[in-house]
Structure formats: C-alpha cells, structure tokens
C-alpha cells in the first residue's frame, strides 16, 4: 500500500520565487546564504539584524538618509507588534508611508519596494484556529518580524550580489519578503 503524504503548500511557491530571483541575476541559494550569514554574524536579535541591513544599504547609497530613517522607524514599529490589533495599526502606518513614498519622484526603488512588500503583506493571525494558526501560536513573536527581516536582508543581499544595482535590491527585497512569508505559514 502506498503511503499518503500530506500536501505541503509551501513547496510549489519556491519554484516561482527562484525564477523571480534568477530573472534579476540573483542565485536564490546565494541570497538565502547571505541573509543567514548576516543573521549568524549579528546573533539572534532580529531587530539588530534589520537595523544593520538598513544602515548598510544607506552606506552603500541604495537608500537616502530620509528613507533610512523611515525604514528604521518602520522596523521599530514592526518589531513592537505583538497582537493582531497592533499589526493592523502597523499595516495602516506602512500603507500610508508607501503612499507618501510613491508620490515622491526621488524615492529609491529599493526603499519603495521594501515598504510596498511590508505594507501589502497579509500575515495570518497566530491565534486563529487550524494547523497553521496552532503552529504560529506556539511561536512567541508575531510573524511580521520575520517578514521585516526577510525584506531587509533580501534587499541587502540582492544589492550586494548585483553590484549595487537597484533592480537587484528590489528583487531581493521582494524575494526575501516572499520567503519569510512562506516560512511564517509553514
């Protein structure tokens, strides 16, 4: 008799994420390794890793000083999220920031993509019933923290791998957000 394996929704998404990364000349495994290398260097503190990624992007010229401050403030608010109500406030703040940045003709595409991914991410509630909700309820922190770090680390890694080409940062940030979102669900 053939064994039944449970269906894992997370396996199919990786193919399209890899294709997106490859379209910008980024090797998915290298991007993932770069994010993990930064995490290992800075330790388990996700906020510290997020802040360092943003600062390095600003030092490299991928984001302006104003955008650096806005992204650091976004991270400060995001890492303070602990409930669904706080997440909704955070998401409305991120969406308002994204709208303001879209109106600014000088906004960097990297910062715009990062804020856009964060503002439009749907994070499932860790308190909802069901297998995913139960798994997430075991985690003590809100999954938006993983998404913030995934977007920042992915953008930084994409910039480094593409020779600081903004397209690499945009794709890296989007891919990092997707990977973090998938991992939050699985």
Descriptions of predicted regions:
Residues 1-141:
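N-terminal propeptides/leader regions of secreted preproproteins
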Residues 140-186:
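Membrane-active amphipathic alpha-helices enriched in small hydrophobic residues
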